[in-house]
Regions:
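Generic C-terminus detector
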Residues: 369-374, 378-428
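Short acidic-hydrophobic, aromatic-tinged amphipathic segments that line or gate anion-handling sites
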Residues: 45-51, 123-127, 158
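Internal nucleotide-binding/catalytic subdomain
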Residues: 154, 158-295
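A conserved helix-loop-beta module that forms one wall/lid of the active-site cleft
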Residues: 92-153
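Active-site "cap" helix and flanking loop/linker of ATP-utilizing ligase/carboxylase catalytic domains
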Residues: 247-269, 287-359, 372
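ATP-binding N-terminal substructure of ATP-dependent carboxylate-amine bond-forming enzymes
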Residues: 1-96
Length: 428
């Protein structure tokens, strides 16, 4: 079988890599893909934009590709699943109505409240004066969020009321474009963030291994938010007891409420949780797709064939699938970024050492890379590479990832040297 994977990041390289491990998958076509998918055996890139739904459907139908797996949230929010389904294609990813769970934080918050899902106290505003009046009745720190899609950068944790007011002004003045037509203001929760990604066919929902990522650009979890600078799985803080509660109090309630709204949600439901020191948790947000870079660690540990799970979700037979099988191991990913990210950065820097990193035992997933005119792999984004290590424990997995990343060079390359630092402190 052939599969079309939509997207060009590290998540999509990991999806293509995992799919190609199956003897049932002959070829993966990535739209538009990156330097890693361009050079991976069994994979090819198709240079179309992720919103060229007509072009994708035409190519898939002409080339006997029955299955489309959608990586990023933007095409899901634009209705790629609805469009391709009308052409007779099988699509993994929720319909446009379901993708609102990520595309509008206000919509997701209302859904959680209706479903009885534990979440932070919040209020929604469509103009700045009322928003500022509200924060003056609350206390800092307080969280200000652009309502719509902002590539993971539309959340500001304001430590003072002045910072909160500035964030409100920035959002309403268009810093995040149409994502900032309204704001969600939320109480600031303390604890550790955990990513619980789950697969659902609209009736049954099965969690994957819980993961944690490092969102801040700087070591010690400082500086600006990013799309994620590293991740590890399985997250020790997500105990079996906590995961059992997440299943009943979050995942099942959310899918039931989506059904109540007439939404047949099939694909990934990703719950971002804040877990307090006492073990209680609340949902910070939902995403409608695989996380990045969490996917890279989760799929590295998955033994069940990915296409079997994807097709079971699409065909609504997930309940009949056997329990998911996992490697008895730990995984860690370190992101190599362009200097200046998440601000301004340069592209087109030649990358060396990729083969050496893999020979050292790391898995190298490409994110912001491409082939230049002389077939060299060069940088093409803020987050460039995701170097992933596996091991019997986190110490081994993290060491493997860092052994790999030390083989890689490009101009102004930056990576955090403390991914998983809290785990190493616990293990030692």
């Amino acid at each position: 079988m052939k599969v079309l994977v939509v997207g060009n990041g590290g998540r999509e390289h990991a999806l293509a890599w995992k799919l190609l491990q199956s003897p049932k998958i002959d070829q993966v076509v990535c739209v538009p893909g990156n330097g890693g998918t361009a050079t991976m055996k069994g994979c090819q890139n198709l240079p179309l934009a992720v919103d060229d739904f007509e072009g994708m459907s035409k190519y898939a139908l002409e080339n006997d590709i029955p299955l489309v797996v959608v990586g990023p949230e933007v095409p899901l929010a634009q209705g790629i699943t609805d469009f391709l389904q009308t052409k007779g294609l099988k699509v993994f990813g929720p319909v446009q109505a379901g993708a609102q769970i990520e595309a509008s934080k206000a919509w997701a918050k209302a859904l959680m409240e209706a479903a009885g899902v534990p979440t932070a106290k919040a209020a929604v505003f469509t103009e700045p004066t009322a928003a500022k009046n509200y924060i003056r009745t609350e206390r800092a720190p307080i969280v200000v969020k652009a309502d719509g899609l902002a590539a993971g950068k539309g959340v500001i944790v304001a430590q003072t009321l002045e910072q909160a007011e500035t964030a409100i002004d920035d959002i309403f003045q268009g810093q995040f474009g149409s994502a900032g037509n309204s704001v969600v203001i939320e109480e600031c929760l303390l604890g550790q963030e955990v990513s619980v990604l789950a697969l659902t066919d609209g009736l049954t929902i099965r969690p994957l291994l819980p993961a944690q990522d490092h969102k801040r650009i700087g070591e010690g979890d400082t500086g600006d938010n990013t799309g994620g600078m590293g991740a590890y799985a399985p997250a020790p803080i997500a105990t079996p007891e906590l995961m059992a509660r997440v299943q009943t109090e979050v995942l099942e309630k959310t899918i039931a409420e989506l059904r109540n709204k007439g939404i047949d949600y099939r694909g990934v439901l990703y719950a971002g949780l804040m877990v307090a020191d006492n073990g209680d948790f609340k949902v910070l947000e939902f995403n409608c797709r695989f996380g990045d870079p969490e996917t890279q660690v989760i799929l590295s540990l998955l033994e069940t064939p990915l296409e079997d799970l994807i097709l079971a979700c699409i065909d609504q037979r997930l309940a009949a699938m056997p329990p998911l099988a996992w490697k008895k191991a730990s995984a860690a990913t370190v992101v190599a970024a362009s200097g200046g990210y998440p601000g301004n950065y340069e592209k087109g820097k030649v990358i060396t050492g990729l083969d050496a990193a893999q020979l050292a035992g790391a898995i190298v997933f490409h994110a912001g890379t491409k082939l230049n005119s002389t077939a060299e792999i060069v940088t093409d984004g803020g987050r460039v590479l995701n170097i992933t290590g596996l091991g019997e424990d986190f110490q081994q997995a993290i060491a493997q990832a860092y052994t790999g990343i030390k083989e890689i060079q490009f101009s102004r390359m930056y990576y955090r040297r403390d991914i998983g630092h809290c785990l190493l402190n616990e293990e030692s």
